[in-house]
Structure formats: structure tokens, C-alpha cells
């Protein structure tokens, strides 16, 4: 065959006429010998194995915190474990070790019940005199005035003011006879009245004051005696005597009238 011819022929690839022992296996098992190993491309590469790698470029962030040393754990020991939260501990309330701060001692009931200007408090010389506004210091007893209501009259309802409402309205009337709109709204809100009720109260209070002042003026004026006329009594005699001569003179001077006599047959 052709394979045997090539092997028998002297060639520079297979020198020598000797046939290899593998020729008896047939043409399928025979193949060309493996080429010799090629020399390394960089024979001196091993000489650079001792070169250290280049350092990595620095990053923008620094290194993290170092791990805790072993001697720290040995010196301080592990920290106490946090207790697990129970549903009862989540409820609102003071902590177990909470102790309220004691309140400062206040004045006893005896001090509160002591009135102003009593024997325990020093009184000034001016406190002995009663002030002209003593009525302003009166306090209405609880439940004494009753609630604000209305009473029925013949034609309309009349508002019944409580003692507290009248006291506050009197205070305002003492300082100003004519209430302003702003003050009227404030008083109505504080006393539980309407602005119309406050306005009507001030109108009635001014009318009452005018009536009282007029009555005082009449009482202060002294009573005047009635006007006496000068009447002089004259005796009747002289006056008649004075009038009679004049009348007689008039009669004497007058001519006598003729009297006509008529006779009946």
C-alpha cells in the first residue's frame, strides 16, 4: 500500500529503512509521531517571580474600625444581654424604681380660713378705713342667686338676672355709664347673657339713675312758702260816706224828668 511505500522510502522525516513494529496493526492504528515540545517563549520569566505586585490605589473611604482585641474581652468581659421585651413591660406606667417627689407643705386649713385683716396678719393704718368700693368685694353665695331664667309678665317675658350678674354689671356701670361694643360682647360671653340683654340692662340702669338724682334734688331744695298778696281792709262807713256825696251830687245836678199822668175813664 501507499503507507508502506512511504515508510520503505528513505526520507528525512523518518530516517532509516527500519519499519516500526506498529505496522502490523493496520493503517488505522498508525499515525505520525508527536512533534518535539517547543521551547518556552519567555525562558527567563521565572527570574521575575520575586517581584512584588503593585500596591492597590487608595480608595475614597478609609478602612473600617478594627475588630476588638482579645485582651479587651478578657479585661471587661462580655456585656450584659438585653432583656427581652414582654407585653406587660410595654404598657404605659411609671418604671418600677420610680418614686414621686413629695409636694411642698402647703398652708393648712386654718391659714386658709383666716380672714384678711385678722389678728395673725399685720394691718396697715389705711386698712382700718372702709373703702368706697366695699360693695365690689362681696361674693355671691353658692346657689344663692339661682340660675338665669325668665319670668312671665302680662305682655312679655322679663329676664331675671342673678346676683353675680347684677354685681358684675354694677361694677361695669360704676366705671362707665355707656358701655362699648367690645366690652358689651365680653360681658355677655362671661356672664352667659346676650348682648341685647346687657344693652337693655344699661338703658334701664341709666333711667333709674336719672330718676334717683331727680328725687334727691327735690329733697335737697327747701320748701318755698306760698305768695302772699297785700290786701288792706277798709271800714265800710267812710268808704260809703265818701261814695254817697258823689252820688248825691250827681243826682242833684241831674234835671228832673216830667212825669206824665194818665187817667183811666
Swiss-Prot record:
Transmembrane segments: none
Function summary: Plays a role in transcriptional regulation. Involved in activated KRAS-mediated transcriptional activation of PRKD1 in colorectal cancer (CRC) cells. Binds to the PRKD1 promoter in colorectal cancer (CRC) cells. Could play a role in the terminal differentiation of the intestine. Binds preferentially to methylated DNA.
Single biological process term from Gene Ontology: regulation of transcription by RNA polymerase II
Stretches for region Interaction with 5-mCpG DNA: 196-207
UniProt protein name: Homeobox protein CDX-1
Subcellular localization(s) per the UniProt record: Nucleus
Region annotated Disordered, chain positions: 9-153, 207-265
Tissue specificity remark: Intestinal epithelium.
Compositionally biased residues, Basic residues: 207-217
Region (Interaction with DNA): 157-178
Cross-referenced Pfam families: Caudal_act (PF04731), Homeodomain (PF00046)
Residue stretches of biased makeup (Pro residues): 30-42, 93-108
PROSITE patterns listed in its UniProt record: HOMEOBOX_1 (PS00027), HOMEOBOX_2 (PS50071)
PANTHER family reported in the protein's UniProt record: HOMEOBOX PROTEIN CDX (PTHR24332), HOMEOBOX PROTEIN CDX-1 (PTHR24332:SF16)
Gene responsible for this protein: CDX1
Residues within the DNA-binding region(s): 154-213
